[in-house]
């Protein structure tokens, strides 16, 4: 349907909302004071009992106390915790309540678990009046505001047919700039901008920027966007309203699917694919028949796996799934499991930053602490973050753990959520866990699942975890603008002709071109390898799946060894490109190398050729007695010493893990480096790695990966995805520059992104 008048569209939207759960009345043209009085009435109805308001209504002074708390909390981030904190405390000043006069009482305001039930009230405010905060400005009117228990939590701005929703989002941003969303309206958590054919929703950024990268379209289970200007005139807005804005969904959106991220200092809202995954997992747990025997075969109940592209917010999705399960009481323990000990730091911090209370997420310093938290019946110990290494040590005969203790723990209803499950599941450690906890339910999260074509040790992801519960591919993510695309560049450190000639001469067993040409047999071989039509630079695959070798297959590692021109050319290219790609040191970069000795060599080359650059290296610090141990030990001391001098730190080899945390925080601009972009002397320009940080590390401030190693399949997507977090117009894509066997890598990249 085509709407010539916005008011007609508003009438129809309100009618749809009333049919989908907003059944407790429509307030027409309310002022802020009208809404405060309405809230006071609902608070009275929900708290009139003898232990709370004792049958006596709230006074203006008592409502002013609540509004003062809202004004003090100020940000949508803090107010999300206020709303979801269930209660608010006031000091009674109503003399009619003799029992509580002058005393503090607690009032219930909202319960995320009372979905379309209990005391929850759902109202619509039409054309609410927003008082101007500046005498120079007029009062403003909104279009529609949705109230849960009297609190204005969703603000909707409408436009008639043919008017782009950018006008609605700009209007919301303008109102915010004018101070419209203050007072009671600070409680708004989610904004919606819509016309009959297009609609987006986004978290209230408060005093932050309104970034269109975080305006989301809603989509169905198959990631097909709803009301995204694709089906003009077909009333797509009705699907949007009945899906996202309906009750129970809108109640859950505020209670469960917003995230107050204390690390980033902002309120976030889940995208539709994150909701679909969380919902699928919580449904699977809710319907699990714990008393029924486990299916035969591998110990443990297969819950399924979530395939969401790297960079799409898997940690937040897995956290929300874990939080919902923990809050639902459908399981006794929810354990978020990571593959590597070092990844635990970032994931634990992220989990805690997402939680209502950091204490709701339990870390595990060692196996004894983990055992104690597993045995605990304290609700605070329900949600545990630990590593696969520690968890695999919870077995009979390990340390001081008895078989009886393991049996008792295994008797609990335990849900495992395994991060980066393509990596962590293919080893003996997961089997140990499954043998110790055969009744547990196992879920996996991965951006790069193992399929038949890249399976390891005979196992695909579905063999280990069961069905794919939800898929959101890299193509979906790039299409929706939820992750950035990649811009890969093949950089030749040797000319193709020179490489081809070296291989051709070697195969012809000739030292010079003249020697090859002088002997017909040698000439035939020589020209075979020199002809691109007969011998490609990189390997090829026939339609039958047969691999045909390319010139680069005949190169030895000596071509790229330390001290060769290759290393110098890589450094030269990075130094040439870095000022432009980093946008004048705004963004950081990573250089991935093939070995620790190479990482050390590159580190020293950068020190020598670019002393002004802030460079460090990160690799496994364990020094053993193998060849190269002395080099590695000396290099560690050098790298740590340089880092200490550069940034005023005092790390030593035994505190290397703390240095890694510091590097992670510095690259991510997380505490204590939230404002590092304003302090050049605190910034790290380039991090040199071998394997560490190429998986599981997230920072929107990293925009370039320099790659001097051969990787394939899922490892390509994992490594490239270090660069694909959204930032803004200064970061349109993640840049990749690759150097080693570049034609081979080009083929691998094309295969990986198919």
Residue map of PLM features:
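A short beta-strand element within the Helicase C-terminal
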Residues: 686-689, 693-718, 734-738
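ATP-dependent helicase/translocase motor core
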Residues: 1-333, 342, 346-357, 379-380, ...
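Interdomain helical connector at the RecA1-RecA2 junction of SF1/SF2 helicase-like NTPases
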Residues: 231-233, 455-586, 603-608
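Conserved C-terminal RecA-like helicase domain
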Residues: 535-689
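Inter-Walker segment of RecA-like/P-loop motor cores
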Residues: 353-399
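Conserved RecA-like ASCE ATPase "motif II neighborhood" in helicase/translocase motors
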Residues: 383-418, 423-432, 670, 689-691
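Conserved helicase ATPase motor motifs in RecA-like P-loop NTPase domains
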Residues: 309-310, 420-424, 436-454, 481
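Conserved segment of the helicase C-terminal RecA-like domain
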Residues: 722-753
